[in-house]
Amino acid sequence: MTNETTTPSEEYITGSEVLLRGLLQEGVECVFGYPGGNVLYIYDAMVHQPDFKHILTRHEQGAIHAADGYARSTGKVGVCIATSGPGATNLVTGIATAYMDSVPLVIITGNVSTNVMGTDAFQEADIISITMPITKHSYMVRDVHDLPRIIHEAFYIANTGRKGPVLIDIPKDVTNQRMAYRPADTVRLRGYHGAPEPNPAEMDALLQAIAEARKPVIIAGGGVVYANSSQELIKFVHTTRIPVATTLLGLGGFPSDDEMWLGMLGHHGVYAANMAVQNADLIISIGSRFDDRVTMKLDGFAPLAKRIAHIDIDPAEIGKNVKTDLACIGDIKNVLAYANTKAQAAQTGTWLEQLQEYKVQHPLRYTDSDTVIKPQYVLEMISETTQGEAIITTDVGQHQMWTAQFYRFKHPRSLITSGGLGTMGFGFPAAIGAKVGNPDRLVVSINGDGGMQMCAQEMAICAIHQIPVKIVVLNNQVLGMVKQQQELMYERRYSQIDLSGSPDFVKLAEAYGIKGLRATNKDEASKVWLEALQTTGPVLVEFVIPTNENVYPMVLAGTPLDQMILGYDE
C-alpha cells in the first residue's frame, strides 16, 4: 500500500468508509442489500455512518428489484449491495431486468481478497464476466486509491446517455485498505459520450415529412419517460395534431385522458392503436426500440408507411429492428424542445376522424359479472379510486396486461413494470423501492398468485419498516398467461400451470405482520379495497378471480398487428 501524508482537508480512512462517503456524495438516499462475509467491512463501516440508510431485504433479488423500483419511480440512481459468490449471482436476473429497460443502477458486490482470486476460493465467482452482457459498464477495484474515481464515474455512466446498470466489484482486502480520502469531483472518460445535441438538419427533415403526411402516428416508448420529456411531447402533439400510441413502458409518458391518446399498441394493444400503426403513412417512434412485442410480425409491420422516423438517444437502436428512413439522435427532451420551436399543425383532420371511429367501434371491453370478480373490474376500480394518481407496480403475466389496459395512467414514472425481460417476482420488491423513493405517494403493487410467491418474503420489510404498500394479489390459481398461450396456440394441451397448492395469502401476510384482506365475490371487492385504502400501514388484498379469464385483444406470434383476437363477437 502506498505511503501517504494527509493534508488538513483529508482523512485516512478504509475502502469501506470511502465507499459509503462516495455514495453519500452522489446523493444516495437509501441502499438495499444483504450482507455476507466479503462485504462485512462495508457493513461494519455502516455502524459509524448514522446518515447512511440501508434496508435489509430477505433475498438479494429483492434488493436489486427494490433498487430498480426506486430508480424508475424517482429518476435517480438505485443502489444495492451483495456479497460475493451466490450473493452476487443472485443479482443477475435483476441486473438483466434493469439493462433491458435502461434503468440506472449502481450494483456493489464483494469479492474474495486479491491474493486468493482465481483459486476457486470459498464464495468466489467472476461476477464481472458473468454480467458483462447485461451491464453498461463494470469495474474491478484492485486498489483503494481508485475507488473515489470509480464511484463517481459509475454514477455518471449509469445516469447519462442511454441509462443502465453499472457494477462495482470490490475484493474484501480492498475494503479494508486505507487511503487519504479526497472525494472525486470530475469525470474523464475517453471515448464515452452521453447524449449528442439534436442535429437541426435531422429535425428539419422530420418536420418536412410531417408536413407531407396525412396519416401520421407517434409511438411513444419508455425513452420519453426516462428523458423526463412528457411535457415536451404533449406540446409537440398538441401543436402537430398527431395521435399517440404508447408502448408498455411508455404508459404515463403521455396522459391517458388526452384526446390524442390512442392507447397501448402491440401484442395486447388496443384496436385503435394497432390499426393506427397499420394504416399510417408516417411512423414516428420516440424512445421506443421497435421490439417484437410492439411490431409483432416484422414484415407485416406498418405496411402502408411511406416513411419511418426514429428519435432515440442510442444510435445503436436506429435500424436495428425496423428499417428507418429518418433518424434523430439525441436526448429526447432536447430533440422535442427543438422540434417545438418549428413544429406546425399537420393535416390530420380526416385521419383523426377515422381513428375516432376505431375507438368507438372497438373499445376495450370485457364481459362483467354480478357475482364473480373479473380482474378487469378490479383494475378499473383501482384506477377510479386512485384517480390515476398512484404509482402502480406490476409483476409479469395476465395481470400486467390488464393493468396496462384498464388503469388510466396520467403521469410519467407511474407504471413500474418489467418490460424487456418480463421478470416474475419483480413487482412487489419494486413497489417497496418506489415507496421508499416516494413516501408521499400512494403505491399499489399488482401481482398474480404465481409471481407473488417468488418474492413474498419481502413482506417482512414492509412490516418492519412500516412501508405502506398496498399489495394486490389477483388469484386465479393458475399460471394464467402460460395457460392462455397453451389454450390458443397449443390446442389446449395444458402443461404444468396448476397453482392450486398455493398458500393462504391472507394468513401469509398476517404471519409477516401485515394486515390481510380477501374478496371472493363482487359485492366484497369494493369493500375490501376501500378498507385497504383506509389502512395506514402495509396491507395485502387478495381478489379471487376466474381461472379461465383471458387477456384481449391479443395478436398471436407470427401475425401482423391488425390480425387481433378481440375476445368478443367481431
Residue ranges and their predicted role:
Residues 36-39, 85, 102, 292, ...:
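Glycine-rich phosphate/pyrophosphate-binding beta-alpha loops
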Residues 167, 310, 393, 446-447:
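Generic enzyme active-site microenvironment
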